[in-house]
């Protein structure tokens, strides 16, 4: 029983180490633009490429996990994540930046998909909680590194931040990967009473023929778009709202509004995952999604109308990320 918790913790650590590839990106956009004179739109194409390769290749990476186990897939993913940020550190053309996005996206997808899938296999009796805790590593992982990354960008330049954090995070993921193991096939758990669960596994071709799959796919594309927009563009939004470097004092801390928002957002984005995982085990998946999606929608609209106030900016971005992390 204790061994599966060790496997869960290892997955959480790996997820935390790849979080900055997505959640820390907004800190780099303006420094890159200032150095090379590229437009924000051109730079953000790299983020789009990253998200596409991070998500769309997960089924293929899942096949490798089924065939070879989680260890080699996460190991390769960790190497690719480190290499991607290493390339970013010296990228002097948009083509190189885009290539690095492909590399790091494949790596992040391999780590993310494998760690979540492995957690579900080790905890068939507590799937919502296991998935939530593992995803929390990704959501909150950058909370402890956002401030030092921001400080390094300000003092030593974004290239050093890419280089040192990329290599460091990649090494940790590789070390974690060496300790991962496949859940035993015979491991069973009691189904959660309040949650409907399928009686059999579906083949990919069968899944594609189910209407509910396409409904869920469209639903999550739309929901993810709102959160990813905030993730990638938060720095630019803060500048447009003129709250980027306005000092905000809350909870005994005084930080620039953007830095404060990023730190709080990452904490809430992490806490919400096990929270909503627990809620979904209690009331079901569909009611939980309805609640979370509604909160996110209200948060984004409120941010649009009231985000020019630095305190409101911090609080409302926290609400958006709390709901989006579900």
Please tell me what each predicted stretch does.
Residues 23, 51-59, 142-143, 266-274, ...:
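Residue-level signature of mid-helix packing/kink "hotspots" within the transmembrane helices
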Residues 37, 69, 90-95, 107, ...:
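Helix-breaking motifs and short loop linkers at transmembrane-helix boundaries and internal kinks
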Residues 134, 138-185:
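Helix-loop-helix hairpin linking two adjacent transmembrane segments in secondary transporters
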Residues 25-30, 205-278:
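Extracytoplasmic gate region of multi-pass secondary transporters
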Residues 32, 110-123, 130-131, 326:
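Intracellular juxtamembrane helix-capping segments at the cytosolic ends
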Residues 220, 227-229, 252, 256-326:
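C-terminal transmembrane helical hairpin of 12-TM major facilitator-type secondary transporters
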Residues 84, 95-103, 311-319:
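Paired small-residue
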Residues 56-95, 280-286:
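Conserved MFS/SLC helix-loop-helix module at the cytosolic interface between two early adjacent transmembrane helices
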